[in-house]
Amino acid sequence: MNFRIWSPLLCVLVLISAAPASAQRQVIHEERSQYRNVLVTEFNGQRCMLFNIHRGDMNQTCIDLRNPKRLVFNYTKMSFAGLLLNPEPERILVAGLGGGTIPMVMRELYPEAEIDVLEVDQAVVNVAREFFGYQE
């Protein structure tokens, strides 16, 4: 394989995949909290929460609008790996709510478990409820 041919193509693909979350997205909600700007955007069938769009921050939470229960990010899927060690948890702690996708899926998988969520920013909780269907 000729590295000279593939090198520029690889660079372009990396740059495209690292594009800021704000590229070509429609902002449907924006509010200033005590800690940061909280934004909700929609693009290509996904609704996402992000912070500080002007700094180029990436998405914190995304849901697939066609299938809201599907976990979009690999890291959210990997957060369930610990359950291999304890397949029937009685108590679960989630640090940081985001859009609430992790605790909502946990609630569906483990309806008997006590799930505690730590979130310091009330604006994030409000946005999770209004735009991501989060229910405590």
Question: What residue ranges belong to the model's regions?
Answer:
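N-terminal, post-signal-peptide region of Sec/Tat-exported proteins
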Residues: N44-N74
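N-terminal, helix-rich and Lys/Arg-enriched segments in bacterial and organellar proteins
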Residues: R36-L39, R47, F51, K69, ...
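A generic structural signal for short, solvent-exposed coil/turn residues
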Residues: L15, R32, T41, N86, ...
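The AdoMet/dcAdoMet-binding core of the Class I SAM-like
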Residues: R25, R70-E136
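Bacterial N-terminal signal peptides
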Residues: P8-S17
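Bacterial N-terminal signal peptides that target proteins for export
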Residues: M1-P8
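N-terminal auxiliary segments of SAM/dcSAM-dependent transferases
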Residues: A21-M49
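Intrinsic disorder/low-complexity segments
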Residues: M1, A19-S22
